[in-house]
């Protein structure tokens, strides 16, 4: 395997669950005040792009645009108060970079929002290439983002690290190994049932998989 590591962002590098959940709550209160959304409803909107989520919830183009603009405004305002890196993420990425690994992000989040989160958490200097939802024509689980990152580095091999089944499916379609992380929402058993190559409970365990 080449020394290219592709990470999802939310739920993998950055703890953003509370940020995203609160953004959804405030957006729904403002834009859909007559509808009720449970915590289970909100959890179901994690993973798909917000474009897909708000298309599903909208009954008009006007409502869709209102949801999108409101969500983006609130999300950026809440970033400094809610976002942080998971334990051992920064130290592990720093070590891997010192060992010659190229580190990229392939996410279903917009590129400028990813960059903002990396800056707030001190990770931006460790990651050169960011593939976001606005970089590709089709988001994960389509493998387009993975292939774009591999092309950027002129590599035909890589490894994907992510917290969702969508990440796993994208890696499978791109025919690269996948490492599932358990500190977000998907359990070790769920990843194994879906055919993950590896599953880790702490980012530092990635070093063992890589022989470092």
Regions found by a protein language model. Name each.
Residues 85, 106, 138:
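Residue-level marker of regulatory loop/turn positions in helix-turn-helix DNA-binding domains and
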Residues 1-3, 94-97, 111, 115-212:
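Asp-based, Mg2+/Mn2+-dependent phosphohydrolase catalytic module
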Residues 12, 107-109:
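Conserved phosphate-coupling serine/threonine residues in phosphotransfer and NTP-handling enzymes
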Residues 27-31, 39-42, 52, 68-74, ...:
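Sparse, context-dependent recognition of short Cys/His-centered cofactor- or disulfide-binding micro-motifs
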């Amino acid at each position: 395997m080449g020394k290219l590591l592709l990470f999802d962002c939310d739920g993998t590098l950055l703890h953003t669950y509370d940020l995203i959940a609160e953004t959804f709550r405030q957006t729904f209160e403002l834009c859909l005040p007559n509808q009720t959304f449970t915590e289970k409803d909100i959890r179901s909107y994690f993973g798909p792009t917000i474009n897909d989520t708000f298309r599903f919830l909208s009954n008009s183009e006007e409502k869709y645009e209102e949801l999108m603009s409101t969500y983006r405004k609130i999300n950026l305002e809440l970033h400094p108060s809610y976002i942080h890196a998971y334990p051992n993420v920064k130290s592990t990425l720093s070590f891997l970079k010192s060992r010659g690994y190229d580190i990229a992000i392939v996410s279903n989040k917009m590129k400028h929002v990813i960059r903002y989160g990396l800056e707030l958490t001190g990770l931006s200097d460790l990651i050169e290439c960011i593939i976001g939802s606005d970089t590709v024509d089709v988001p994960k689980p389509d493998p387009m983002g993975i292939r774009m990152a591999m092309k950027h580095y002129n590599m035909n091999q890589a490894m994907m690290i992510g917290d969702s089944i969508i990440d796993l499916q994208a890696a499978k379609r791109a025919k690269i190994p996948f490492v599932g992380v358990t500190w977000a929402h998907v359990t070790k058993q769920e990843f194994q049932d879906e055919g993950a190559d590896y599953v880790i409970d702490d980012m530092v365990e990635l070093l063992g998989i890589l022989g470092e």
